Amino acid sequence: MTNFKTSIVRLVAALFAAALCALAGSVNLGAQNDVRTAKPSGAAFETSIRTHESRADPQGGHQVPPANEITTGIETASWTAPTRTSVMTMWNSVSGANGYLLDVSCSSSFDNFVGGYHDMDVGNVSGRVVTALRVGATYYYRVRPYTTTGPGSYSQTMQATTNPTTGLIINATFDSSITADPNATAIEAMINRCVSIYESLFSDPITIEILFRYATTAPDGHPLRPGATARSDNGVYHIPWSTYIGALRADAKTSNDNSANASLPARALATIVRASSAAGRAVRLNTPPGMFANGSAGNGGPYDGIVTLNSSAPFQFTRPVNANNFDAQRETEHEIDEVMGLGSDASVSYFHPQDLFSWSSAGVRNITSNGTRYFSINGGLTNIVNFNQSADGDLGDWLSEACPQTHPYVQNASDCSGQPFDVA
């Protein structure tokens, strides 16, 4: 495992080393907006809300249909491994059942219940991902089918244990747009796979809170932009340059961290650094979650960010992915990256941690959308990946090839259908 912090050293570096994308339709990852909000009570820094949208490229052969044209079929979900704070509960379907009532307990005798999981109506599905659990704990679960005449008998008692390792925790919360969807089990399992991948990569003992949605609207209810396939919203803290750089230097733990720190500028390139709430905590700054489910920010907001998949886009939640479908797992990972802290506006006026490692050649920085710009942690000597410089895509993402892509990285500025991949 690695240290989450300077990736924006390793986060940045790990992400492009893991490919993802494919042929047919392509997705351009669009402009990001930075909307200022009030400073949360108890927080040391002013905040804003940052929005990122992924958009379908009409040249790629796929158009996102109107909101009322949802064509995704019911997918069969497979079991996914536990994360540090979640398990996937699964059961056999009962013929004629209208739905199932789920119990989850810390005790095999069910003399106590995990909050909310006592006769929880999970709908007519065959599984549910249970989140916000304790690390390394065993949980017991059972279900009862129900019909119009009432509930049936309990299933056998089953059990699952959360991952006992320490490190990064991503607490996933599922919006009702997911839990009420016929594909809820497949969607939740896909998100759980994403979380498991990230937790296996990063050892920093911090917790990131993300709300996941599957809808045709943004968190505040307005329609997603035409052609949008996915969106992320997250809180951004405006941290004085010296404060952020000092925290970054102090948090060095690996040789990559040391190389990256050695390449930091001797003089400030901007007055403030805009770091996501998760990225700020990764370097031990006071940047708590502060986003509410409606996309607003303020005191007591429980989320670091919100990830929305467009429910009218041709997504597939299981693999292998059909050539005509976009891989939901790849798209979800991209938006998780944004919540964790990746992103750039290629401007010193909106300076982000990623911009600290943006170069045009050895010893020559470039934080503009002109010319060549690439990621390097050794002063530009090694070009790890080129940044996108096209206004049609997100300036914080990787330069992308035409579909089919030879290097289909998760963080590419355009996505292609039919070829899944993951961060690694």
Feature roles, as predicted:
Residues 101-136, 148-149:
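Recognizes extended acidic, P/S/T-rich segments that occur
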Residues 12-24:
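Bacterial N-terminal signal peptides
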Residues 1-9:
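N-terminal secretory signal peptides that target proteins for export/translocation
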Residues 80-88, 122-127, 314-315:
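Ser/Thr- and Asn-enriched, surface-exposed coil loops between beta-strands
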Residues 164-331, 338-424:
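Extracellular zinc-dependent metalloprotease catalytic-domain scaffold
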Residues 40-45, 49-53, 57-96, 135, ...:
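Pro/Thr/Ser/Gly-rich low-complexity, intrinsically disordered linker/stalk tracts
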